[in-house]
Amino acid sequence: MNLREDKKWAYGAGSFLRDAVGQRPLMMYAPVQTDKAAESAAEINKELRAVIGAKPLTHAEIDKIKASRVRALPGSYETTGAVLGALSANQLYGRPDDYVQTLKARIEAQTDAAVQAAATQVYRPDALTWVIVGDLERIEKPVRALNLGTVQVLDADGKVVR
């Protein structure tokens, strides 16, 4: 929200965890102005570190997240394909048959402490792989200056250029 509402550098930004057997990738995205690519990455890094450090999620933030997840539930099962996908996911991930029916209550039952503990476990800023796309001539130097890790430049086919 900071990149969009406070800084006005992006139309939107978000994150999500992909369902997976084993490790679940945390995906974050923020299409930003080219001239703010490095500053935006720095801001995301700062926010992640704050959430697991000096500025944990507030009760209001957690309630907003839970309410959003609950409100999205009906739309997640609008089509037969979506229902079939949910049933398949239940099988794949070893979920009980009543997983969908109990999901709302389980979301609402999450305590602030449990959500914060999960955030602390999932958000590992030093383990992130950053993929920053943009005008190389304009963003390479400031992105490298962030020292987020080894910088590789890839071509349009994903081959390492340098």
Task: Please report, for each region that a protein language model flagged, where it lies by residue.
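M16 family metallopeptidases and their MPP-like homologs
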Residues: 1-53, 59-112, 120, 125-133
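Proteolytic maturation boundary segments
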Residues: 112-120, 124-162
